[in-house]
Amino acid sequence: MGLQCGIVGLPNVGKSTLFNCLSNAKAQAANFPFCTIEPNVGVITVPDERLTKLTEIVQPKAVVPNVIEIVDIAGLVKGASKGEGLGNQFLANIRATNAIIHVLRCFDNDNVIHVDGSVDPIRDKEIIDTELQLKDLDSIEKKIQKVEKMAKTGGDKEAKKTFDVLTVYKNHLLSGKSARTAPVAEEDKEYIADIWLLTAKPVMYVCNVDEGSVSTGNAYVERVKAAVKEENAEVLIISAQIEAEIAELESYEERQMFLNDLGLTESGVNKLIKAAYRLLNLATYFTAGVQEVRAWTITQGFTAPQAAGVIHTDFEKGFIRAEVIKYEDFVKFNGSEAIIKENGKLGVEGKTYIVQDGDIMHFRFNV
């Protein structure tokens, strides 16, 4: 679906180390290739144990996993909103993404200098927040100038509503808060859709900790959790140092042994990719046949015809019905369609069916 998460963070917080770990195919549980579109963009396999299980049952000729694009966004300094440093490029890159992964330094290490001289993840967060908020204020001011006259003098109800919504966002941003927490009804957000507010994008915070804090967190992490409570954002604890060590290991077995020794069940990279998928409000359905078992990415809430359209637009246009098997039932009956039917577990769904995460689907269509 071409959806992107952008990784942001100040210099020396571990952002590039994490991106490099993500961009290393060896660091992923399944050996699907990582490819680079350009130096700072990676297409990364989404780990999914269900796909592995379906592959074991069906034994297909080909397996196609879900992927997600991760963008390493460089160039943030104080003043980026005014174009300082690589500010203009930074802001253009972040505007193109669908969600933000914000990496914060939550470890002490005298050998790794901090751009501001001391470790303070809340200050670091606020530096980036402020630059994005300033850029959003600039975008809002420009739009207000366009609609203000019509809103105040004419009888243009649309302009009046747009002006009112923009004013709510403006006051919220002026109070030092991000657009995503503004008290605006979901249906009113369409009034700002054309100005692509940076701080309206969903965000996740990654606390980069030392090796000893990866299981439990530390005082820095607790401060971050308290600071982002209002945003209802996910906070992940990852050690970029550990992830870099994992990336050096050759085999999946070696990586699992290494994680077990640390008391971890999966790598931080895997956790991060899965969390990014959730952040983008995505879901997965599967098609399963001897030629191919494949994971398909959809937005949560897609109807059956919309989901069919992800495979090919003809599937959506000529949609007749969808045959649906729940993942749990497919596994329980070892993929036998005959037994699944006998047990009444093969659903036949029409155009209004909302596809559920994990559904195994077969579409009937006529073009």
Regions found by a protein language model. Give the residues of each.
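Short, flexible surface segments
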Residues: 96, 356-357
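Flexible beta-alpha connector loops of hexameric P-loop NTPases
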Residues: 76-82, 117-132, 151-157, 212-213, ...
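Conserved G1/Walker A P-loop phosphate-binding module
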Residues: 1-113, 122, 141, 147
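Amphipathic, soluble alpha-helical interaction motifs
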Residues: 57, 100-103, 131, 143, ...
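C-terminal-of-GTPase-core extension/linker across diverse P-loop GTPases
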Residues: 2-8, 13, 19, 146-354, ...
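Conserved nucleotide-binding/hydrolysis micro-motifs of P-loop NTPases
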Residues: 24-25, 50-51, 75-77, 105-111, ...
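Short amphipathic alpha-helical segments
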Residues: 30-31, 112-116, 217-219, 249
